C-alpha cells in the first residue's frame, strides 16, 4: 500500500484580505465616531496594510475595525501582525504585515512537535515554506492534523493535498 500524505502551509487569500480592507475603509468613512478624524486604511506594498488617523485612540480603533473584518472573512489573527502607533507630524500611523509562509524556525517547531507527540511511523519533511507529512496510515495523518489544530503555534496553518 502506498504512503498517504498531506502538506502543511500558511497562506492567506489575498482577495479576502482585500475585501476585509475595503469593508473596513467603508465603515471608517461612514461611522460617526470617525468623522473629522481623517482616518484612512490602504495597502502598503503587497503584504502590508497602513492605517492613519489624527489621534492615537482613533488609529487603534481603526485597527480593531480591520481585525473584526478579517475575523468575519475567516482569516486568522495569527496572519496579521499590527505594529504600535507611531506619530508622524499631526497624524498617527500603524503598519500591519500580512504573514504568509512558514518560517524555518516555525517549521522546525512543527516537525519536532509531530515527531515527539505524534503517532509512530509519521515522517515530516520541510520543503521551502511548507511541510510534507507522510505515513502508511491515514488515521495517523488525521491524528496529526487534530494535534496541530490544538497546538498553540504562532502561525496560521492550513492542511492541503491530503492523499
Swiss-Prot record:
Matches recorded under CDD domains: YajQ_like (cd11740)
Source superkingdom: Bacteria
Entry GO terms, CC: cytosol
GO MF term (any one): nucleotide binding
Pfam family, any one: DUF520
Keyword field: Nucleotide-binding
NCBIfam families, sorted: PRK05412.1 (NF003819)
Functional summary from the UniProt entry: Nucleotide-binding protein.
Family assignment from sequence similarity: Belongs to the YajQ family.
Listed HAMAP family: YajQ
Protein name: Nucleotide-binding protein MMAR_0920
Species for this entry: Mycobacterium marinum (strain ATCC BAA-535 / M)
